[in-house]
From Swiss-Prot:
The keyword Glycoprotein does not apply. This is Nuclear shuttle protein. It is found in: Host nucleus; Host cytoplasm; Host cell membrane. Pfam families: Gemini_coat (PF00844). GO terms for biological process: DNA transport; transport of virus in host, cell to cell. Keywords: DNA-binding, Host cell membrane, Host cytoplasm, Host membrane, Host nucleus, Host-virus interaction, Membrane, Transport, Viral movement protein.
């Protein structure tokens, strides 16, 4: 019997009418079924470590990050190694969440640059820091990363909007450009650079994978990355002799 509802909102039970000659039969016993799921002992334990959110820090500075007039440098962001000590990764892939960078650029005039009257010339130039995603990382016959000119056509293009050359667009794409137009009247000038680049969001995830051929090669270096390496290109263009020294810290947030 199911309760019915009248117009006032109260409930009453409708009485079923049975004939007087109705013979009642004792209901037979029915098997009771337990539909609740019970834990199964046949499931195999998952020995694979759980992925966790981590952050890896890296500083790029030193003699190899000093640029002369109208020159460029190519570098890459190191990924975590496969291992137990953090920051690490537990599998042959990681999810890239966000890349932050912060640092300084020091512009120094070359002592040989001097006007006829003995005064120091004014330095005007453009400094660029470009983050590029390499979909299919591998080194060419030269054993080096693609140069700034090979990837963007020419260093002079840093004065305008940079774009990857048509021959390399299937492999590379620009993720972020930090540009500073500088005018230096003194011997030296310090400039701050800072940026934050989201690599994954709710709709799209950016995964990096590794070759990990053997135990000794399970590193986070460029040569061991098989998909989505992060490259950094520095470029310094000036009309008078001057050098640019960079000290930039990178923090990569990832799940691995």
């Amino acid at each position: 019997m199911y309760p019915s509802r009248n117009k006032r909102g109260s409930y009453f039970n409708q009485r079923r009418q049975y004939s007087r000659n109705h013979v009642w039969k004792r209901p037979t016993a029915a098997k009771r079924h337990d539909w609740k799921r019970r834990p199964s002992n046949t499931s195999k334990p998952n020995d694979e470590p759980k992925m966790s959110a981590q952050r890896i820090h890296e500083n790029q500075y030193g003699p190899e990050f000093v640029m002369a007039q109208n020159s460029a440098i190519s570098s890459f962001i190191s990924y975590p190694d496969l291992g137990r000590s953090e920051p690490n990764r537990s599998r042959s892939y990681i999810r890239l969440k966000q890349l932050r960078f912060k640092g300084t650029v020091k512009i120094e005039q070359v002592p040989l640059a001097m006007n006829m009257d003995g005064s120091t010339p004014k330095v005007e130039g453009v400094f660029s820091l470009v983050i590029v995603v390499d979909r299919k990382p591998h080194l060419g016959p030269s054993g080096c990363l693609h140069t700034f000119d090979e990837l963007f056509g020419a260093r002079i293009h840093s004065h305008g909007n940079l774009s990857v050359t048509p021959a390399l667009k299937d492999r590379y794409y620009i993720r972020h450009v930090c540009k500073r137009v500088l005018s230096v009247e003194k011997d030296t000038l310090m400039v701050d650079v800072e940026g934050s680049i989201p690599l994954s969001n709710r709709r799209i995830n950016c995964w990096a994978t590794f070759k990990d051929v053997d135990r000794e090669s399970c590193k986070g270096v460029y040569d061991n990355i098989s998909k989505n390496a992060l490259l950094v290109y520095y470029c310094w263009m000036s009309d008078t002799p001057a050098k640019a020294s960079t000290f930039v810290s990178f923090d990569l947030d990832y799940i691995g």
